[in-house]
Amino acid sequence: MSFAADLAKFPSATSVTVNSEGGAVTTNLQQGLAKLWCNWAGSATVNDSFNTASITDNGTGNFSVNTTNALANVNYCRAGFAVNTAGTSGVLLDSTTTITQTDSTTVISIEVNYLNDGAVDGNRDEVIVHGDLA
């Protein structure tokens, strides 16, 4: 079988296992891939994204990231970062402080806070989500 024939199998595979550098362990590649990422301006204007249908601006520093393809459940892991309007890094994307929205498989709630200054609309907000797709 040719290398091209082997590569052709990947799109239909339900699992891709990769050996570690030393070969002692394996990892499931699909489990390690980001299922969503988005880079947007504080006005909810999407600069670039993957699996992001849109951003909803719910108020200062409060956003809903709307997915293109649903996640399997709400037990996903999100991480994010932002730059505040003064250009200072260190803004935290958070989902546990004052947001009233509830996470779902199609909406990821994000709040942008800058240290002790409260909610802000960052100049550049970024989020990445790991989990299972539906």
Language-model segments: residues:
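Extracellular/virion structural assembly segments
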Residues: 70, 84-85
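Extracellular jelly-roll beta-sandwich "head" domains, especially the C-terminal globular C1q domain
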Residues: 86-134
